[in-house]
């Protein structure tokens, strides 16, 4: 029920406010799924051997997935009517 959720106003937020934790297990599956969902077919996001050949320890998350997780965090904290304008 959406009425249970409140959107924070600027007056309710201050620089230095402590934000709640958001625990997300970052797995290879999440990294690969995020890359495929955003149509990012660069092999370093889904092929461990290619990532290692590039000097990386494993596949790594693409920027769009990172941004999506940050937007999720911000809007979960700030409320359903909040809009993320920039990160």
Task: Identify the residue ranges that each predicted region occupies.
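Catalytic strand-loop segment that frames the active site of acyl-thioester-processing enzymes
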Residues: 2-59
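Hydrophobic beta-strand-centered segment that forms part of the acyl-chain substrate-binding groove
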Residues: 51-87
């Amino acid at each position: 029920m959406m009425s249970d959720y409140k959107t924070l106003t600027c007056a309710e937020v201050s620089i230095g406010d402590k934000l709640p934790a958001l625990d997300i297990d970052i797995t290879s599956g999440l990294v690969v799924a995020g890359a495929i969902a955003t149509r990012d077919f660069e092999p370093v996001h889904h092929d461990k051997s290619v990532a290692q050949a590039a000097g990386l320890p494993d596949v790594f998350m693409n920027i769009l997935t990172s941004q999506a997780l940050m937007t999720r965090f911000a809007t979960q904290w700030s409320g359903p009517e909040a809009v993320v304008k920039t990160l």
